[in-house]
Swiss-Prot record:
Domain of life: Bacteria
Name this protein carries in UniProt: Large ribosomal subunit protein uL16
MF (Gene Ontology): rRNA binding; structural constituent of ribosome; tRNA binding
Keywords, in A-Z order: Ribonucleoprotein, Ribosomal protein, RNA-binding, rRNA-binding, tRNA-binding
UniProt similarity note: Belongs to the universal ribosomal protein uL16 family.
UniProt-listed CDD domains: Ribosomal_L16_L10e
Function: Binds 23S rRNA and is also seen to make contacts with the A and possibly P site tRNAs.
GO biological process, one term: translation
GO cellular component: cytosolic large ribosomal subunit
Organism: Methylococcus capsulatus (strain ATCC 33009 / NCIMB 11132 / Bath)
Subunit structure: Part of the 50S ribosomal subunit.
SUPFAM superfamilies: Ribosomal protein L16p/L10e
Pfam family, one: Ribosomal_L16
Amino acid sequence: MLQPKRTKYRKQHKGRNTGVAIAGSKVSFGEYGLKATTRGRITARQIEAARRTISRHVKRGGKIWIRVFPDKPVSKKPLEVRMGSGKGSVEFWVAEIKPGTMLYELEGVSEELAREAFRLAAAKLPVQTTFSLRTVM
């Protein structure tokens, strides 16, 4: 599963996820992309589940790029523990997703195969997505 090798601080504030993605919003590496249209948090497990789905559907053909990385720790207190006595321990890692963020890219397969693979992967993700093609400049 994806998570940082080391961090400066173990825990982070929750923060607010506002605005739209400017950087990382275009298809940069492959021919086709899966772009988020709503905001949310994607866990490392969800990223891996969607990656496996894409990989299995294209029968390990083509090349996949994961354009998001879970770099934010989410802490949680154990069940039935009273409030206070500090922040809980880190439970999992998430990637903050803004509308317009490119999540995955794919090349080396046909467009209909890529569309179907991304449709199946989108079912594993908590954000709404759209299929995106590379625009030649």
